[in-house]
Amino acid sequence: AEHVYRLSIAERPHIDFVVPPAGQPGKVGRFTLYGRNLPGGVDSGMVLEGKPLQKKEVTINLPGDAKARMNLSGTSPVGPRQAGFDGIEYRLPSPKGSSNPVRIFFSDAPVIGEVTAPNDRPTEAQKITVPCDYAGLFYPRRDRDWVTFDAKKGDVYWVEVVSDRLGAPTNPFFRVERVTKNDKGEEKVSTVKEVTESPVNVGGTLFNTTSVDPEYRFAVPEDG
């Protein structure tokens, strides 16, 4: 009699993911919801597990007070890998009822979205300004995205991918390359570092925070 469960069947919206997954606290952000039964949603052209997804743009006001920054409230469970991220829980309202909850995390830097133009080759790299949070999509499967930015000698950056810790079934990898030009204007590319994963567990066996998300401390050796 103690082993009970609840089965709910409804026409309410279902959100699969949000782009970007983070925004700056204290600001109003534009977000695109991807899912099914989204009121006013349009075809996204994407398919997830054989099912077409809709998309819908929404405006969300992210709280910026100190209390909100230190609180990760909501009804959905938070695993050890996500426990280090602050944010809010969001539900899309509709006449059929509110959607499932999704988390939108706080970013300390401006959020830059992936361009719609192709950026899956080095020659098509998207130019960004750092520091920033770059929000992209691994779509289609085995997608590659290239970005480029200017760096000065002596600058130090933390380059970090957050995907596995968002609950996505991914195994990210990134490469840092330096692009220089000779007197003729010809580009030369050299690899600085390839990073596959950073399996750091700060919680021990009782609170395992291990993730396959890669990170790298990039100390800029030369202007580039």
Language model features with spans:
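Short, aromatic- and glycine-rich surface loops/edge beta-strands on solvent-exposed regions
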Residues: 1, 83-95, 104
